[in-house]
Amino acid sequence: MATTTGLTEVVLYDTLVNYLISMARLVEGAMNRALDAIVSFESERTASLPGEVFLLEPRINEMEIVIDEHAVRLLRRGSFTEDETRLIVAALKITNDLERIGDIAVNIAERVVSLRDMTQAQTPEELAPMAEAVRSMVSRSLGALIFRNAELAAQVLECDDIVDQYGDRIFEHLLQRMTKDVSRVTPDLQFVLATRHLERIADHATNIAEDIIFWVRGLDVRHGRGLALLPEQQQEDVVVRRTADVTDNSSALYSGVTPSCETQRV
């Protein structure tokens, strides 16, 4: 009987992790479509992507509810090991950040719909590499979740400042452009909002990475605490491939872009 009970508990906790991974894949799929759409909003190849993002939102919201209910079911079981407690706490927080990334993907898709009707709209030069840096952060967070890899999660924390720097430079460029040509104010404000959306996705990816480190290592690295306690990166790195639902045109659209925070080896 004890063995059966133990096996049941293992299955329940593995199910929670699998639910998280499933939700993360949906969210990354929505985000990738939104990023492809905003960077190449004029292309006919990306015209259908905003609609696909809108269709994914209810599925993401449903997964949030499923995970919350499953976590509550685990909490009702009573006693937990330290690892199990950290997993439940991290899962509830990660789910919230994933749901917010899904919402932001919808916000970006809405910007794209508006921009496609604006003749003066012109994509800022650094928006593509900024989007790639954000894409990489979310991809690494998903990889860290799948492989329970604290070192990969720590790499995400290092990228947040780079995304903020892109956002600051794009804002300055757009401000100068709007000052010189008032006809660009309406479309450029859409891009200002889009860069803010990207920064928020990066913030949520950072939160997820911090929660994964807490779950795997028991370290609270929020606000820079305890990060020095993480071990150095292993000598021989292994490429982490993105297994998420990436849009087909992503590689073609960005084949010439070298992001500052690209997917690395762990």
Give the ranges of each region predicted by the language model:
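Cytosolic, long alpha-helical scaffolding segments
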Residues: 1-266
